[in-house]
Amino acid sequence: MAKIINVIGREIMDSRGNPTVEAEVHLEGGFVGMAAAPSGASTGSREALELRDGDKSRYLGKGVLTAVANVNGVIRTALLGKDATAQAELDQIMIDLDGTENKDKLGANAILAVSLAAAKAAAASKGIPLYAHIAELNGTPGQYSMPVPMMNILNGGEHADNNVDIQEFMVQPVGAKTFREALRMGAEIFHTLKKVLHDKGLSTSVGDEGGFAPNLASNADALAVIKEAVELAGYKLGTDVTLALDCAASEFYKDGKYDLAGEGKVFDSNGFSDFLKSLADQYPIVSIEDGLDESDWDGWAYQTQIMGDKIQLVGDDLFVTNTKILTRGIENGIANSILIKFNQIGSLTETLAAIRMAKEAGYTAVISHRSGETEDATIADLAVGTAAGQIKTGSLCRSDRVAKYNQLLRIEEQLGEKAPYRGLKEIKGQA
């Protein structure tokens, strides 16, 4: 038994300069796991609650000392003496201790940090990498793959201070044979895009996730400069590299309309889906995330009907990594993919359940970071250990993003051919 002998919580900083919760779980035998909770900017209304202190005299109210006290107090007391390898049991203890639907008593940030730290400690006690331990928890031991990265190289929306409405424009190096090659391709395109923007007299400052954030005349212009960069870098758009969007449409949904203030256009629900389809007809866009508001289920049905057979339609704010909401989506044929974010649901066990449910229904699962990150690279191990096939972890700069890519490089080196990189086959509608 990997007996828990101590649980420690502390307040640390995330990549946006805001506090977050870090936890350590100590086991008999000297094994220790440490993990930190990430934090989102564009958040779904049904996400598990990130507990903040609200004390304006500290960190402008964003402190997490209450959540940290919960880790060092009731959570620690409840977990002492328990077996760290019994992940589902540990997570259930914390969920029951909280007793709320959205973890607003103890805080999803407190519960998640401990949940992930326990998994890391358990892996250490077993003498195996975290991805291997996750595969065992997932009921898929030894089944691995390297994820296709969705690299967020141009930012708008809530992730940038510019006039571009769509939140993320991403490249996917689907033509690569290995993850290492995919990363190189993405980096070359990123640096080429910087030159393209600079030569046009556009800003090369970066947003929260490391993508460039220039002011552009339209969302189509963003796709055009990316196309130019891909081709200048020596790659073929549509073959070597495909495109993906995260609209984060809930952020510009007002009074039943989709208001693209940056380019002065307003759409009704079906009109915005038609607009996205027109972009996908012009460019090789193979994945669109949150293409409509989280509450616009009729609109999602239409979007799935007109694009779902050829394009991966990813629910982020729509599903918030929640199996209850995902069940409704599956039953109604809404979207065909789910974005997976640990902190939307608040524990490793519930995260794995969402991935399993998606896969069993023929939906893809895209593992994702948040805009507020730390050096914690657990999502890299999650992507490989569940053979999810896709990962979103930002651009090719900022160490909080690159930490995940570097961990994937290490894992690929360890696993070799046991973790294939399958490219386009991983993306819904493209196999």
Curated annotation (Swiss-Prot):
Cofactor(s) it depends on: Mg(2+)
UniProt: Mg(2+) binding residues: D246, E289, D316
Active site: E209, K341
CDD domains the UniProt entry points to: enolase
Disulfide bridges in this chain: none
PROSITE patterns xref list: ENOLASE (PS00164)
Classification via SUPFAM superfamilies: Enolase C-terminal domain-like, Enolase N-terminal domain-like
Binding site for (2R)-2-phosphoglycerate: Q167, K341, R370, S371, K392
A cellular component annotation (GO) from this entry: extracellular region
Signal peptide: none
Record GO terms (molecular function): magnesium ion binding; phosphopyruvate hydratase activity
Enzyme class: lyase
Pfam families: Enolase_C, Enolase_N
Keywords carried by this UniProt record: Cytoplasm, Glycolysis, Lyase, Magnesium, Metal-binding, Secreted
GO annotation terms (biological process): glycolytic process
Keyword Ion transport among record annotations: no
Compartments, record wording: Cytoplasm; Secreted; Cell surface
Function: Catalyzes the reversible conversion of 2-phosphoglycerate (2-PG) into phosphoenolpyruvate (PEP). It is essential for the degradation of carbohydrates via glycolysis.
Protein name, entry field: Enolase
Source species: Shewanella sp. (strain W3-18-1)
Gene: eno
